[in-house]
UniProtKB/Swiss-Prot annotation:
Belongs to the class-V pyridoxal-phosphate-dependent aminotransferase family. NifS/IscS subfamily. The active site is at 328 (cysteine persulfide intermediate). Gene3D superfamilies: Aspartate Aminotransferase, domain 1, Type I PLP-dependent aspartate aminotransferase-like (Major domain). The lineage of its organism: Bacteria, Pseudomonadati, Pseudomonadota, Gammaproteobacteria, Pseudomonadales. PANTHER family: CYSTEINE DESULFURASE (PTHR11601:SF34), CYSTEINE DESULFURYLASE FAMILY MEMBER (PTHR11601). InterPro entries: Aminotrans_V_dom (IPR000192), Aminotrans_V_PyrdxlP_BS (IPR020578), Cys_deSase_IscS (IPR010240), Cysteine_dSase (IPR016454), PyrdxlP-dep_Trfase (IPR015424), PyrdxlP-dep_Trfase_major (IPR015421), PyrdxlP-dep_Trfase_small (IPR015422). The keyword ATP-binding does not apply. HAMAP family: Cys_desulf_IscS. It is an enzyme of class 2 (transferase). Pyridoxal 5'-phosphate binds at residues 75-76, 155, 183, 203-205, 243. It is found in: Cytoplasm. It holds the Pfam family Aminotran_5. This is Cysteine desulfurase IscS.
């Protein structure tokens, strides 16, 4: 077993060796290095063929038409293109948007920007289980609502929203639905023939593909219109200009092909690993699972260890690569905004650790990690005067602390 152990698969995944092999064939002079937009020679035609094959592979994972897949640089760009693109195009119909408080920053910062431009945004509060329900969305709908944006799987707590039901509601009310699915490809079944979703964002690097490439699904029937955010050569049917990186697109296509093939078996294996890990911690005092344990992807376990500061626990677990909060906000010492929205107090939000498992995680690693976590938590609690007070039966919420 090699140390440190990587248990942060929701931040990024390593590229699958099969993906790396396919990508390497699109780089060198004797490989498929051409510009897919070069229409006058065989190098361009071959590159275009590879890119279109990859587009088909992405579409097949989510049961979409390849013509509905637009290449982007990642899910952040896809979220921006979908939300700003729709808001601006349909602004004459209305300027009200609905999203949730626990979306990824790529969605929240985009809606904040639209608020500065005069749009009105309603931020839904999830239940304690971390889920956004159709009833919550329905209660917020107005006559001037043009877009609802709700994530499929939450990046911090791994909860799965019932997108099919939310889609039935939005379609019946003539409102467009955007879904950030960066964390769900290869983990949850997605069928865009059945789901009434209008726009969906994807990322390659959360699914064992390369960083720097993603895609946006844009429904053709009924047709969704977007205002482009990047202008140039009119690539991707005018929605997203810029020379396509053949090797990146091919990498994402291969990653999604493997995801489609291996998803059922992989989910079974990873569920067993997560449950094995959790069983070894379950008996600990003041241990809380954040988010629903049932409506959740197998890869994620987000735990709060009360009376232990999350950052100090991460430092104590130097052999484990884990995180508190999402990778995009893990540099901030603020408590997780996702856990605060679930109703967790600051102390519990601060004491949370996200463990995420993946394709290359082994049983041996999981057992080692669980033992290390128990050891570190016990040690840090021994040092904590708050833990002593709690053990003595002091109600810490009623203590009036002296100010300095």
């Amino acid at each position: 077993m090699k140390l440190p152990i990587y248990l942060d698969y929701s931040a990024t995944t390593p590229v699958d060796p099969r993906v790396a092999q396919k990508m390497s064939e699109c780089l060198l002079v004797d490989g498929n290095f051409g510009n897919p937009a070069s229409r006058s020679h065989v190098f361009g035609w071959k590159a275009e063929e590879a890119v279109e094959n990859a587009r088909r592979q992405v579409a097949e994972l989510v049961n979409a038409d390849p013509r509905e897949i637009v290449w982007t640089s990642g899910a952040t760009e896809s979220d921006n293109l979908a939300i700003k693109g729709v808001a601006h195009f349909y602004a004459s119909k209305g300027k009200h948007i609905i999203t949730s408080k626990i979306e990824h920053k790529a969605v929240l910062d985009t809606t904040r920007q639209l608020e500065r431009e005069g749009f009105e945004v309603t931020y839904l509060e999830p239940g304690e289980d971390g889920l956004i329900t159709p009833a919550m969305v329905e209660a917020a709908l107005r006559d001037d609502t043009t877009l609802v944006s709700v994530m499929h799987v939450n990046n911090e707590i791994g909860t799965i929203n019932d997108i099919a039901a939310i889609g039935e509601l939005t379609r019946s009310r003539g409102v467009l639905l955007h879904v950030d699915a960066a964390q769900s490809t290869g983990k949850v079944e997605i069928d865009l023939e059945k789901m009434k979703v209008d726009l969906m964002s994807f990322s390659a690097h959360k699914t064992y593909g390369p960083k720097g490439v993603g895609a946006l699904y844009v429904r053709r029937k009924p047709r969704v219109r977007l205002e482009a955010q990047t202008h140039g050569g009119g690539h991707e049917r005018g929605m997203r200009s810029g020379t396509l990186a053949t090797h990146q697109c091919v990498g994402m296509g291969e990653a999604f092909r493997i995801a489609k093939e291996d998803m059922a078996a992989e989910n079974q294996r990873i569920t067993a690993l997560r449950d094995r890990f959790y069983r070894q911690l379950e008996g600990m005092e003041e241990l809380y699972v954040n988010g629903s344990l049932t409506a959740r992807v197998p890869h994620n376990l987000n735990l709060s260890f009360n009376y232990v500061e999350g950052e100090s626990l991460i430092m104590a677990l130097k052999d484990l690569a884990v995180s508190s909060g999402s990778a995009c906000t893990s540099a901030s010492l603020e408590p997780s905004y996702v856990l605060r929205a679930l109703g967790r107090n600051d102390e519990l939000a601060h004491s949370s650790i996200r463990f995420t498992f993946g394709r290359f995680t082994t049983e041996e690693e999981v057992d080692y990690a669980a033992a290390k976590v128990r050891e570190a938590v016990d040690k840090l609690r021994e040092l904590s005067p708050l833990w002593d007070m709690f053990k003595e039966g002091v109600d810490l919420s009623s203590v009036e602390w002296a100010a300095h």
